[in-house]
Amino acid sequence: MSDYDETALVCDNGSGLVKAGFAGDDTPRAVFHAIVGRPRHQDDMDDMGKKGYYVGDEAQSKRDILSLKHPIERGIITNWDDMEKIWHHTFYNELCVAPEEHPTLLTEAPLNPKANREKMTQIMLETFNMPAMYVSIQAVLSLYASGRTTGIVLDSGEGVTHAVPIAEGYALPPAIMRLNLAGRDLTDYLMKILNERGYSFVTTAEREIVRDIKEKLCYVALDFENEMATAASSSSLEKRYELPDGQVITIGNERFCCPETLFQPSFMGMESAGIHEITHSSIMKCDIEIRKDLYANNVLTGGATLFPGIADRMQKEITALAPSTMKIQIIAPPERKYSVWIGGSILASLSTFQQMWISKQEYEEIGPSIIHCKCF
């Protein structure tokens, strides 16, 4: 197995959720909100004792009295003090492990700034005193989880969307495309269109209700114009949703107008290309020899790709953009909300991977820049 006595940990840090657990497991042991909450008022502070902050689901449940911060914005860590609190909570409260005993695989967004990678390495090996660590790009791990090493991954989570072409296990940075539109933006957009219809969703608690409506009732239309016509002429697409207070609301074309923004960001006033176009552009930026393999291995991953109908729509849109002779295959694994974590679990438990770890000793000899030599 490995040179380390204890099982490796796998920690996938997303803008919305932290997924953490043990290498070799099928699913993450802990999944919780990537948030840190602090009291808005001094009186609430006094009730909390010395800690002065809450992390994860506890912060989420007390959101009425707390000011919530997301240390990961659009996939990138922007608040290191809060991120450290989240990691501390992950190891000690969620996984109940001593981090100094476990090598740990962390995930990162594509095109993560060099300084960020070094800072992650430093915190793991110095602050948490880990025996070893490694950092892997999220999209690459999702591809591994699907049983592939070459393909293009469309990863859309809570904070950001990327199209990442990968050849033989290595991401191709010049061809990576990024779209600042993901799950959180879709929730905001659904709130907006429901408010325009006369419903009132304003508070953070009401935002959670809208997120639930999005996750339970929204879907991607194969043909948006046709679907709009159907919704206008009949009630066949309408669904009822019961609010916590017992009131029942009817959701019609909002069901597919909300996720349509992934294909038409202009709905939200963005000038960006849609997910099908960034996927195609990314493929076109790659060498002509590997394009065929990318078209045939198009993997969807992340929570914002869970909408029913999204794979069929991607198939239709990319077929329209690609050369007519090209075989297009869209792969949408049912477990894609956790594909990144699953890929990390597979990778960190491979016997061939054990030489890849950055050991504490190597770190002490070379410093944080070792991350660029060993993780790419």
UniProtKB/Swiss-Prot annotation:
Q: Would you tell me the Gene Ontology cellular component terms?
A: cytoplasm; cytoskeleton
Positions modified as Methionine (R)-sulfoxide? M45, M48
Pfam families xrefs: Actin
Is ATP-binding included in the keywords of this UniProt record? yes
Question: Does the UniProt entry include the keyword Nucleotide-binding?
Answer: yes
Q: Which domain of life is it from?
A: Eukaryota
Chief place where the protein resides? cytoplasm
Q: How is it modified after translation?
A: Oxidation of Met-45 and Met-48 by MICALs (mical1, mical2 or mical3) to form methionine sulfoxide promotes actin filament depolymerization. Mical1 and mical2 produce the (R)-S-oxide form. The (R)-S-oxide form is reverted by msrb1 and msrb2, which promote actin repolymerization.
The Gene Ontology terms for molecular function here are: ATP binding; hydrolase activity
Localization per Swiss-Prot or TrEMBL: Cytoplasm, Cytoskeleton
What Gene3D superfamilies does this protein's entry cite?
3.30.420.40, Actin, Chain A, domain 4
Under SUPFAM superfamilies, the record lists: Actin-like ATPase domain
**Where is it made, tissue-wise?**
Predominantly expressed in testis.
Keywords assigned by UniProt? ATP-binding, Cytoplasm, Cytoskeleton, Hydrolase, Nucleotide-binding, Oxidation
Q: What quaternary arrangement does the UniProt entry report? A: Polymerization of globular actin (G-actin) leads to a structural filament (F-actin) in the form of a two-stranded helix. Each actin can bind to 4 others.
Instruction: Explain the purpose of this protein.
Output: Actins are highly conserved proteins that are involved in various types of cell motility and are ubiquitously expressed in all eukaryotic cells.
Task: Write the protein's name.
Answer: Actin, alpha anomalous
Native organism is Takifugu rubripes (Japanese pufferfish)
